[in-house]
Swiss-Prot record:
Gene Ontology cellular component terms for the protein in this record: ribonucleoprotein complex; ribosome
Keywords: Ribonucleoprotein, Ribosomal protein, RNA-binding, rRNA-binding
Database matches in InterPro entries: Nucleotide-bd_a/b_plait_sf, Ribosomal_uL23-like, Ribosomal_uL23/eL15/eS24_sf
Subunit structure: Part of the 50S ribosomal subunit. Contacts protein L29, and trigger factor when it is bound to the ribosome.
Entry protein name: Large ribosomal subunit protein uL23
Length: 109
């Protein structure tokens, strides 16, 4: 499989997990397994992954009422990965780089 990471999952709950426990949440491909996810995070962000937990999320069922009857459908199933890093490491979602506990210098002048 190429790259199982699709996007970071940024919600209020996932941001709290990042701040409190150092866990990061990503939306990943449904066919991805834990070892593929771990390798992709380590390669993309250059960090050491301590553990990976995954959750399969079922897509919502949708119904549309028309004159001819009811049209039923379903959104796609997807998977979330909870990634815990080793102590002192962090991921910066927005730049794609890592922060190894060093403070960034500001260039205000």
């Amino acid at each position: 499989m190429r790259n199982p990471l699709m996007q970071p999952w940024l919600t209020e709950k996932s941001t709290g997990l990042t701040e409190q426990k150092g866990q990061y949440v990503f939306k990943v491909k449904s066919a991805a397994n834990k070892t593929e996810i771990k390798a992709a995070v380590e390669a993309k962000f250059g960090v050491d992954v301590a553990s990976v937990r995954t959750v399969n999320c079922l897509g919502k069922t949708k119904r549309q009422f028309t004159r001819k009857g009811v049209l039923a459908g379903k959104k796609n199933d997807w998977k979330k990965a909870f990634i815990t890093l080793k102590e002192g490491q962090a991921i910066d979602y927005y730049s794609g780089s890592t922060d190894q506990g060093e403070e960034k210098k500001s260039n205000k002048g």
